[in-house]
């Protein structure tokens, strides 16, 4: 796993959750896009946990191009808020992208990490409902989540 998030508390929490998982052999950090690319060169099959909103990407296209460059990597977008347009563009571009929101329950985040470790796509309940509804609001989490996809 490569944790690409600029919030120290989020990194610490993610490290803690991942350290409790059975199949987590490698935990790395990246503080910017250059470090992320360097880590992906060394570990091209890694799962990247990315807070897109806090990272130095110029847009969804740049993230998709990076995925094309490192085709064997999987991505779990882990952010506070993502626009529906961004989510559609990225999630429909490749099955390698999944999404969980920072306000999801611990159980839903753990499910997302378990799916990611098995190279399975995960889309949290709120985002899947948002995409299915055709709404154009941002993916700001709701207080209650019912069912997860994995």
Residue map of PLM features:
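Short hydrophobic/Thr-rich beta-strand motif most characteristic of the beta2 strand and flanking loop
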Residues: 23-31
């Amino acid at each position: 796993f490569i944790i690409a998030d600029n919030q120290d508390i989020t990194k610490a929490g993610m490290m803690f959750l991942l350290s409790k998982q059975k199949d987590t052999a490698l935990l790395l950090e990246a503080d910017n896009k250059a470090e992320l690319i360097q880590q992906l060169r060394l570990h091209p099959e890694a799962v990247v946990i990315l807070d897109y909103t806090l990272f130095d990407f110029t847009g969804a296209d740049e993230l998709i191009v990076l995925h094309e460059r490192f085709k064997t990597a999987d991505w779990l977008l882990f952010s506070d808020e993502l626009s529906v347009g961004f989510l559609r563009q990225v999630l429909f571009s490749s099955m390698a992208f999944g999404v969980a929101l920072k306000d999801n329950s611990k159980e839903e985040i753990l499910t997302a990490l378990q799916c990611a470790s098995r190279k399975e796509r995960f889309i949290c309940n709120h985002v899947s409902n948002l995409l299915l509804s055709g709404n154009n609001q941002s993916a700001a989490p709701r207080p209650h989540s019912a069912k997860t996809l994995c």
